[in-house]
């Protein structure tokens, strides 16, 4: 609708007539009424009408305005100084009111500063009046610029959010170089230098200190450096850094992590807290002149300790989130394939130069450990020391155990074991790799630890092959041993000895029937059965 002439509006000759719209205390241009009329007290809320005055002093009420209207030249409202403006007779300020349905109550100190704005003008145009009143029909648009942010360190204009703080490019680069180069600064004064844009280069110690005080994170620099290195490294041994998708929310990652850590703490004797509370005591193994007898004797005793841990591994696997998507037969295949790597990861905190600490405090000295595993014992100790040295927590070890268990099988391994859950296994492996990455990179030096831990996958698989070779002596003498059936099954001891030189990571095997111990073979007349001393 448009403001044309007086007949288009309902005239209210009596200003005290009750109005159905919001009124103002200074509605009369003649200034004869300086108080708030009684009609304001009875105004209803939520109406869209307007009110104004004619030069004669008569009050009129407009209809509910539409989204667009124009003030035309020559109209009564425009000639009277724009129907959307009214003057304060006391302060001589002119108020700008009701543009496009909004009541801004914008005012100017003098009438000459008031603008005649087209109703089609945006709201921001009313805040910036034009220099002249003559151009009443020209639409003027003024845009509010983006707010300028300043560097929290030096006060210069910020370029973005860097390393956890709004900062400029100069302080961003300075902080990154200081962390990557591990520079040790010194202050020549009292470490209270003022850091401003003009003086930020005078004292690097105080500037670096203010970067840290402002909230810049050293870990953010290390994580960025690690990601860039992984992106640029195209070698086969490079570590893949997974990206956390939006579907794997932080809540899900935390829930999975807590479930795995809780299961590991419940079904492991070698957590950080438990191993510290164990009191060591000697574990005697009877030593004879025959080295073969000694080794078989040691395994006869040691196998029962492994049997207990294998049962705990099975209980741990039952609590792994998402592992129920894999059928029971395929779970057994994965456990048999990775039995030794899982066992080694679980006992890393129990191994030392002294030997292996058992769950009840008995200590298998390192000499006896070499009797059991041969040269593999030295590599087991080196691997355990490496895991502890790089700073793996119980949570890291628990997630890494799941990751090793979920390693995808080769095509040959799938065929030989009739494995059916390869797709589900790939999804689980990728998921737990992302969970492990996210949890480890949240702490200082977590990126470097993650990178080193991923390289341990290849080392674990290599040790697994060496372990299979070391157990050939048990396969050859299985008829003379009374080993727990679960140990025989998990380590595949009922098959023929494995060749030393082979290319496959795992040879074909025929699992022994569960819950049945292997039948002892009758010795030939030329052989004499050797008793086993426990």
Swiss-Prot record:
- The residue ranges of the NR LBD domain are 252-493
A GO molecular function assigned to this protein is: RNA polymerase II transcription regulatory region sequence-specific DNA binding
The segment annotated Disordered runs over: 30-53, 119-139, 502-534
Q: What compartments host this protein?
A: Nucleus
Which intervals hold the zinc fingers (NR C4-type)? 151-171, 187-211
Q: Which UniProt keywords apply?
A: Differentiation, DNA-binding, Metal-binding, Nucleus, Receptor, Sexual differentiation, Transcription, Transcription regulation, Zinc, Zinc-finger
Task: Fetch the Gene3D superfamilies from UniProt.
Answer: Erythroid Transcription Factor GATA-1, subunit A, Retinoid X Receptor
PROSITE patterns on file: NR_LBD, NUCLEAR_REC_DBD_1, NUCLEAR_REC_DBD_2
The GO annotation for biological process reads:
cell differentiation; dosage compensation by hypoactivation of X chromosome; hormone-mediated signaling pathway; intracellular receptor signaling pathway; negative regulation of transcription by RNA polymerase II; positive regulation of transcription by RNA polymerase II; primary sex determination; regulation of alternative mRNA splicing, via spliceosome
Q: Which family does it belong to?
A: Belongs to the nuclear hormone receptor family. NR1 subfamily.
Note the PANTHER family from the entry. NUCLEAR HORMONE RECEPTOR HR3-RELATED
Q: What function is annotated for this protein? A: Transcriptional regulator which is involved in the sex determination and X chromosome dosage compensation pathways. Directly binds to five 5'-A(G/C)(G/T)(T/G)C(A/G)-3' sites in the promoter of sex-determining factor xol-1 to negatively regulate its expression and promote hermaphrodite development. Together with fox-1 is involved in making the distinction between one and two X-chromosomes. Plays a role in the fox-1-mediated repression of the functionally active isoform (isoform b) of the sex-determining factor xol-1 gene to promote hermaphrodite development.
Full protein name: Steroid hormone receptor family member cnr14
Where does this protein come from, organism-wise?
A: Caenorhabditis elegans
Which gene holds the coding sequence for this protein? sex-1
């Amino acid at each position: 609708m448009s403001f044309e002439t007086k007949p288009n509006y309902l005239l209210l000759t009596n200003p005290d007539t009750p109005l159905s719209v919001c009124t103002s205390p200074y509605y009369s241009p003649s200034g004869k009424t300086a108080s708030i009329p009684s009609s304001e007290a009875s105004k209803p809320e939520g109406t869209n009408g307007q009110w104004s005055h004619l030069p004669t002093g008569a009050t009129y009420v407009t209809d509910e305005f539409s989204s667009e209207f124009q003030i035309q030249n020559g109209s009564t409202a425009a000639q009277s100084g724009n129907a959307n403006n009214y003057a304060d007779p006391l302060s001589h300020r002119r108020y700008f009111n009701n543009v496009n349905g909004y009541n801004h109550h914008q005012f100017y100190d003098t009438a000459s500063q008031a603008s005649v704005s087209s109703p089609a003008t945006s709201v921001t145009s009313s805040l910036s009046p034009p220099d002249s009143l003559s151009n009443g029909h020209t639409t003027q648009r003024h845009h509010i610029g983006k707010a300028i942010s300043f560097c929290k360190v030096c006060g210069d204009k910020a370029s973005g959010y860097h390393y956890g703080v709004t900062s400029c490019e100069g302080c961003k680069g300075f902080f990154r170089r200081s962390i990557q180069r591990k520079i040790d600064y010194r202050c020549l004064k009292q470490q209270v230098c003022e850091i401003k844009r003009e003086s930020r280069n005078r004292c690097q110690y105080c500037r670096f200190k203010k970067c840290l005080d402002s909230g810049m994170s050293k870990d953010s620099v290390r994580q960025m450096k690690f990601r860039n290195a992984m992106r640029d490294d195209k070698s086969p041994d490079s570590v893949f850094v997974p990206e956390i998708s939006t579907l794997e929310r932080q809540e899900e990652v935390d829930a999975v992590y807590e479930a795995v850590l809780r299961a590991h703490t419940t079904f492991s004797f070698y957590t950080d807290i438990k191993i510290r509370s164990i009191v060591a005591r000697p574990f005697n193994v009877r030593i004879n002149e025959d080295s073969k007898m000694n080794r078989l004797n040691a395994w006869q005793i040691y196998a029962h300790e492994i049997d207990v841990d294998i049962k705990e591994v099975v209980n741990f696997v039952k609590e792994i989130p998402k592992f129920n998507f894999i059928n029971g037969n395929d779970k057994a295949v994965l456990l048999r394939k990775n039995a030794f790597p899982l066992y080694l990861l679980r006992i890393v905190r129990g191994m030392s130069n002294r030997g292996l600490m058992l769950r009840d405090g008995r200590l298998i000295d390192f000499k006896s450990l070499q009797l059991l595993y041969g040269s593999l014992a030295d590599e087991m100790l080196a691997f355990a020391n490496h895991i502890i040295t790089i700073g793996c927590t119980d949570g890291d070890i628990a997630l890494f155990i799941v990751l090793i268990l979920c390693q995808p099988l080769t095509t040959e391994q799938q065929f030989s074991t009739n494995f059916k859950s390869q797709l589900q296994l790939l999804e689980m492996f990728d998921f737990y790799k992302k969970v492990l990455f996210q949890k480890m990179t949240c702490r200082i030096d977590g990126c470097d630890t993650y990178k080193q831990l991923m390289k341990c996958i290849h080392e674990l698989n290599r040790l697994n092959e060496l372990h299979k070779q070391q157990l050939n002596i048990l396969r050859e003498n299985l008829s003379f041993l009374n080993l727990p059936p679960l140990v025989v099954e998990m380590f595949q001891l009922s098959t023929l000895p494995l060749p030393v030189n082979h290319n496959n990571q795992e040879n074909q095997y025929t699992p022994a029937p569960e819950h049945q111990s292997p039948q002892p073979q009758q010795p030939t007349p030329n052989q004499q059965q050797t008793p086993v001393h426990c």
